[in-house]
Amino acid sequence: MAIAQNQDIKYRIKDELKMPDFNYGDIWEDPKSGHRIGCLDISKKEDVEKLMHGQKAVLAVQDPPYNVDINDEFGNLPLNQYMAWSEKWVDNIIDILDANASLYIWSGADVKNGLQPLPDFMIMMRDKPVKIRSFITMRNQRGYGTQKNWMAIRQELLYYVKGNPIFNVQAEYTDILKKTKGYYKKINGKITENFERSKSLTIRAGNVWHDIQQVFYLMHE
């Protein structure tokens, strides 16, 4: 009885949580928070300006297609076409950034095709009015591998800044205890390891991320 009851609740919830019906050009604004969600083309300047409604952003997080043909959702373009498209949306996003803003861009590297588009994208960004601040690697919750290679489980995140945005360094400190000892060094004639020299017993977040819950876009979660 309990199992049947749980299944009934599951299906009722599934029926109630229907996907929003968006058509191209539609923008929905949350009446409580003011958040705006649009079905738009990021490579079109007028679409980006329509979503921003005259406002500027202090933070932008972009997760474009990686130009890797991994399923039926996204194909892959010739690299020159992909880069031309990328340059359009990058310019549009930079235009709506505040004078002091942070820009995070997820990217991928196709090991079967010269690691494109990651290095090409990074070179393109050198000519943009933003500065690279960090090259972050995230360890995915799941990966894929073969019997003849290391499992592919990493994902790249580029962190750029425009102007001089605030960076809250205190937010980097976690409650995770340090575990790895080593890095021995002589201080005042005494051999010490990094635990003894550290000002904190917990880990400070760096540019390698792990244990972050992911939402997989092919799953209804």
Regions found by a protein language model. Give the residues of each.
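Core catalytic lobe of class I
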Residues: 1-220
